């Protein structure tokens, strides 16, 4: 037998380690065509990282308590909006413009002095601050809606008109509140189950079907997972205060099950909206269906009965959280209390890799977007590429300086494209470090 064929592959190693946080990293999100990463920690700090230079774009103390979730989106004209949810019971929306980056604070939390006061440094614009519940340790989920009530997504042309958030109810620990921006109002509540009592809401995911139906997948302290739906598109007029008062949203339960024996720690819905996966304090990872309201298997709330999950896998490793499904659905990953990051097949749910680097427990995972990566080119690099060409027009023979500028722009574009086309996996740990991996 060929000895080369039986050689054990060397363990995977991180591409880079970001050492900026002084406390556990609880939230990660890769955005801006894989060029930016936003991270949030247990002391309330938010850091926006440039994944090309691996340096901070800005850092600020966004919350007085731990950050539960952070999301970033490009909203046109080079601007970014950062959504953060903290244990100080605030859900904040921050705006970061390209022209602001030169004077925004870049001092990382690990370098900040104890005497530094929150807000004393220059930070991004605060657009909204919603009072929401954070006692459950359950992070928000969000979805963008166009004026016709159909799913939308921020782009270079701007942000959709309406944004919806799902968060735990302030009084009913098992209930789900739905908030709306820009009105900053609560528009609906899904009450907790009374029989059986599920305990606190532990994880929630809000999404909108192509027809405009509003879905909420939720997970609970007793191990239950459920799916609710509001049928019918919510057009812009539906968010008016008077309309909501006279026409409260009606919710039907499509699915419920209790595959977990311990509190559910995380769940994520597949981008195709065909299923979702949950992880728990037990060792199980479970794939669940998302019934279509028009399918033959749809059971109205009145005649409801519990259904079976699609697949249950006993991983033999308890305490896996931060579960995320990659955009192509080929793999998903979890962050383990045992300091391991585990990567699984999206189809078979078989364990594909165990990433070992951190010494302490891991809490959060983020994937880069793998969709249409070959065509990804950042707007800034594209404009940089074109400017020297314009300068050369009418100046034939005088290419010494302009030629050099063009070369620098080309190098920058190539660096951006390399980062954009990397299959990023980021993991945040109790040690405050973020490991960046290129995998599958």
Curated annotation (Swiss-Prot):
**GO terms of biological process kind:** chromatin organization
- Annotated WD repeats reside at 20-59, 62-104, 196-238, 259-300, 315-354, 357-399, 403-440
What does UniProt give as GO cellular component? nucleus
Note the SS bond partners: none
Question: Known SUPFAM superfamilies for this protein?
Answer: WD40 repeat-like
| Location of this chain's protein in the cell | Nucleus
Question: Which InterPro entries does the entry link to?
Answer: WD40/YVTN_repeat-like_dom_sf, WD40_repeat_CS, WD40_repeat_dom_sf, WD40_rpt
Q: Which domain of life is it from?
A: Eukaryota
Query: Which of UniProt's keywords are assigned here?
Result: Chromatin regulator, Nucleus, Repeat, WD repeat
| Region named Disordered | 376-399
**Gene3D superfamilies for this protein:** YVTN repeat-like/Quinoprotein amine dehydrogenase
Kindly indicate whether the keyword Repeat belongs to this entry.
Answer: yes
Q: What does the UniProt function comment say about this protein?
A: Component of the ASTRA complex involved in chromatin remodeling.
Give the record's family classification. Belongs to the WD repeat ASA1 family.
Q: What's the subunit arrangement here?
A: Component of the ASTRA chromatin remodeling machinery complex.
Protein's UniProt name: ASTRA-associated protein 1
Gene that encodes it: asa1
């Amino acid at each position: 037998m060929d000895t080369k064929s039986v050689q054990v592959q060397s363990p995977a190693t991180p591409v880079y380690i970001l050492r900026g946080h002084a406390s556990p990293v609880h939230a990660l999100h890769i955005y801006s065509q894989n060029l930016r990463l936003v991270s949030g920690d247990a002391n309330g700090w938010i850091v926006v990282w440039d994944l090309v230079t691996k340096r901070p774009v800005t850092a600020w103390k966004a919350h007085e308590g731990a950050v539960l979730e952070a999301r970033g989106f490009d909203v046109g004209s080079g601007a970014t909006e950062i959504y953060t949810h903290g244990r100080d019971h605030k859900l904040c929306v921050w705006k970061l413009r390209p022209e602001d980056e030169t004077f925004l604070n870049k001092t990382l939390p690990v370098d900040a002095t104890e005497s530094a006061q929150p807000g004393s440094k220059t930070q991004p614009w605060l657009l909204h601050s919603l009072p929401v519940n954070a006692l459950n340790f359950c992070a928000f989920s969000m979805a963008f809606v166009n004026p016709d009530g159909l799913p939308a997504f921020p782009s270079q042309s701007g942000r959709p008109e309406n944004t919806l958030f799902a968060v735990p109810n302030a009084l009913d620990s098992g209930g789900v509140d739905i908030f709306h921006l820009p009105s900053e109002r609560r528009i609906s509540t899904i009450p907790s189950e009374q029989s059986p009592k599920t305990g606190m809401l532990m994880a929630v995911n809000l999404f909108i079907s192509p027809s405009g139906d509003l879905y909420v997948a939720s997970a609970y302290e007793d191990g239950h997972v459920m799916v609710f739906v509001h049928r019918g598109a919510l057009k812009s007029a539906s968010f008016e205060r008077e309309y909501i008062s006279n026409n409260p949203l009606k919710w039907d339960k499509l699915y419920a099950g209790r595959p977990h024996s311990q509190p559910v720690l995380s769940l994520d819905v597949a981008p195709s909206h065909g299923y979702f996966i949950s992880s728990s304090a037990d060792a199980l990872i479970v794939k669940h269906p998302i019934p279509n309201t028009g399918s033959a298997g749809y059971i109205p709330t009145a005649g409801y009965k519990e259904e079976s999950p699609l697949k249950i896998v006993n991983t033999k490793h308890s305490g896996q959280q931060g579960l995320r499904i990659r955009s192509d659905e080929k793999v998903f990953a979890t962050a383990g209390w045992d300091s391991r990051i585990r990567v699984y097949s999206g189809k078979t749910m078989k364990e594909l890799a165990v990433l070992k680097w951190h010494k302490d427990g891991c809490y959060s995972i983020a994937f880069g977007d793998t969709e249409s990566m070959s065509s990804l080119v950042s707007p800034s690099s594209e404009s940089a590429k074109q400017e020297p060409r314009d300068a050369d027009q009418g100046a034939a023979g005088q290419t010494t300086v302009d030629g050099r500028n063009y070369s620098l722009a080309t190098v920058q574009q190539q660096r951006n494209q390399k980062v954009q086309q990397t299959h990023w996996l980021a993991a945040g740990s109790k040690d405050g470090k973020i490991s960046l991996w290129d995998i599958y």
